[in-house]
């Protein structure tokens, strides 16, 4: 069988310490999973069921990249997150077995065009243009859980131009990784290659052209992204 157009390139993430890569199938993001962040966004951080939104698989971009400032926004925000890479699929996964489905972990950014997201919220429309744009998901190489275990506590932070903007601890997650996996698997079949970004701590805020972003999760890794100086050309069709 042949395709009528060239097949899209398979998005993938490096696996730390190897020449292998992890193919990305889908990207799920958990909304408001740290109490302080929920409050700063104007919500009550109780244990309501988590909610999810998606980014396209090809939104992933490797740590270390210099990126063009995204189009159509004047309010680009950073959100540092623990990235969970699914290595074994399943549906209705029990909480007690959920971590068996994890291949490994990374550090990622849920970059957000906050002005477009807010416009969509005000109009009661979907968030895709605010969340699901090109290169909106920088990610570090993944570390297999077989080597680092399953991080449930430890510092998670983000700096902009050397100044700490976000600071939290993984133990502040309202929904732990295993709970998120179990709940999401009730609605969709999880498959190898799925990523889950498990929420961001307080301190989300704007970044501009020329800014350097540095993120960290204890025991998982360090992420660095730079936005090109103002005037850098975006690739045209």
Give the label of every model feature segment.
Residues 2-22, 33, 37-45, 106, ...:
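Catalytic-pocket segment enriched in acidic/His residues
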Residues 1-102:
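Extended, compositionally biased flexible segments
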